């Protein structure tokens, strides 16, 4: 059970793998996903490692598969995902896979090349068909006398005078529709108005054979006179990427050509359909297996990457690897090695040897789908130091609770809970869909956090008795007005003469006792509602904050005990807990004392806690003004201040001085430079054991004391301790004030909710007519939208970030160093989930 509250115990192990069995053994280990390989060749270039050729072959196969996948997605063919986990192919199977992928790639490339050529021919014939159809209309217009007048500028005046026959040349083609205006202006300027342009739009968009996009085009015909203008026109057409086509001059020739073009288009369409059918069959066959192929290739690539991290012994028959692994999983790792050896057919077993090392192991916290999100919250602050207390189990409760204190609303909590329950119930379907939306994936990964935040918000909403800014009168109010008339001095004239009246709980029957659960609903209509709620929430925030911080300081004790650091207990934990309890723990006691010591009859004489707390630090106790809370208060408060002040030098001086004394004593005894040699004591080398007098243990008190490789610097130690002491003492004050954000955010949420109700939904409820009922439909839609957008999303995100800050800074800095590095075992699970690149 203790492993739940701190990271797993890790060990460094050495693997001896036979060359013929190494591939299968690594495959089994990565299928298990419990080992992290260390790079034993950090100085060797990646291109000079033993298995670099195999890695390149895997990358080439991966490239071919990505090409096939791109073609499949382009054809809108669904990729079949059965969730199958294929076995890793043997190295000898790589040749067959390469040949298969090469065949599919070449076939697809050949189909694409042929299809592109066919589509280009089809496009040209289609454009020619439209040219022949449109130009007939243009030539018919040429016979119009008005056109002759319009085009008379193409002839020189002296030529017209000679009565020479009108002989115009022309070119016809197709151009993108958006280029027509610029094309026309360019022709006019370059040819100085000596050309005549006619154009008509093609109604249907045409497919580009290269990109596959559909573009709108227009047919044009340009009339000119002379070879010089003809050359200019062709140059301009070439510059605007217009396609020119031959067009017969006589109607009969155009008709015959159009007939031939239509026949060729029909034949070409048939060939295109057959080509597309063949391409679809190839892609559909590939779509059934491409996910399995991807997994196989990437598993092989991962294995060869891992083998490149290993050393090769001088005989070239054995690979040596070093791995970090959890101690509890050593047996399963041994079984995996045995399975790998059997699959490879090797007769020599692989050897797993635990190593002794002074290196800090990686941090590994076991999680499940429920605790994974909370562990990510902790890890975002910093990966825990090896074997220190893990805050995640406590964060499971404290994080959603502090969020709910700021977000307390019964109605909003229900909406948040329903959304989280929907994600939890459909998690299998959502996971299988593999949604690529980054925002939704982030929200979905925190579904259990949102679920607990919603449930706790329902609870705190009932405590505050707040549901969409309105109170729920479940048990009936405990306050009554009648006794103010029957026993008190209220009359009808009192009601008429006063705009605001205050109930007196000291009169019997006015206050019937505490509300069974939460706050009495009568406060929702009271004019002093904010005064009462602010006082309640402010004191509650201080109480919760101090309890939270004291709990964090208490957790540091378990770290000191586990790492066997008595100095940190006596000169760290004890003065820290006394300092905080003497000042702020005493404040919590005063709050509870004032709540219980003063009732309705004596509440008007209750002194101010704020004034008392300030006077406590100033040692100021005036005779008049704020009355004492209890007898002997002055002496107790002076004693607590003195104790708190004594804790400062206790934290600051004692530990550095004791460390200095221990260093000088060891130096005097000469043990620090004892000439022994440290040798790792592995389980198979019992004879290689030379133990030094001052040998260190990873869990000993001396772990933080200077070793023979270090020089003790009293100045550095003193400065470090001074920084820690100042940070803790000032942090107690600032962190306590920081917890007032619980009150501030709760107040802001309640006020926003009330404003939204008053300014939106109240308008629809106020109109008593049929039109008001119809308007309420739209008003409620606006109210629901604003509630979700502002109060649930924006306010929820704000409360989430503030709760995050309270845990990272105010809570975790009391015991959590977070200077470790994460245990990152490579697992085939990441490949199956499509996270290989991560």
Swiss-Prot record:
Q: Which residues lie on this side of the membrane: Cytoplasmic?
A: 1-388, 427-441, 556-573, 660-725, 811-838
At what positions is Phosphotyrosine found? 364
Q: List the disulfide bonds.
A: none
GO CC terms on record? clathrin-coated vesicle membrane; cytoplasm; melanosome; membrane; perinuclear region of cytoplasm; plasma membrane; synaptic vesicle membrane; terminal bouton
Primary location group: membrane
- Per the UniProt topology annotation, the Vacuolar ranges are 408-409, 472-535, 595-639, 751-771
A single Gene Ontology molecular function, please?
A: ATPase binding
Q: Where in the cell is it found?
A: Cytoplasmic vesicle, Clathrin-coated vesicle membrane; Cytoplasmic vesicle, Secretory vesicle, Synaptic vesicle membrane; Melanosome
Residues bearing PTM Phosphothreonine: 250, 360
Q: Which domain of life is it from?
A: Eukaryota
Report how it sits in the membrane.
Multi-pass membrane protein
Q: Where does the chain cross the membrane?
A: 389-407, 410-426, 442-471, 536-555, 574-594, 640-659, 726-750, 772-810
Q: Which GO terms describe its biological process?
A: regulation of macroautophagy; synaptic vesicle lumen acidification; vacuolar acidification
InterPro entries tied to this protein? V-ATPase_116kDa_su, V-type_ATPase_116kDa_su_euka
Q: Which UniProt keywords apply?
A: Cytoplasmic vesicle, Hydrogen ion transport, Ion transport, Membrane, Phosphoprotein, Synapse, Transmembrane, Transmembrane helix, Transport
Tagged with keyword Membrane: yes
Sequence similarity: Belongs to the V-ATPase 116 kDa subunit family.
Role played: Subunit of the V0 complex of vacuolar(H+)-ATPase (V-ATPase), a multisubunit enzyme composed of a peripheral complex (V1) that hydrolyzes ATP and a membrane integral complex (V0) that translocates protons. V-ATPase is responsible for the acidification of various organelles, such as lysosomes, endosomes, the trans-Golgi network, and secretory granules, including synaptic vesicles. In certain cell types, can be exported to the plasma membrane, where it is involved in the acidification of the extracellular environment. Required for assembly and activity of the vacuolar ATPase.
According to the record's subunit comment, the protein's assembly and interactions are: V-ATPase is a heteromultimeric enzyme made up of two complexes: the ATP-hydrolytic V1 complex and the proton translocation V0 complex. The V1 complex consists of three catalytic AB heterodimers that form a heterohexamer, three peripheral stalks each consisting of EG heterodimers, one central rotor including subunits D and F, and the regulatory subunits C and H. The proton translocation complex V0 consists of the proton transport subunit a, a ring of proteolipid subunits c9c'', rotary subunit d, subunits e and f, and the accessory subunits ATP6AP1/Ac45 and ATP6AP2/PRR. Interacts with SPAAR.
Name this protein carries in UniProt: V-type proton ATPase 116 kDa subunit a 1
Species of origin reads Rattus norvegicus
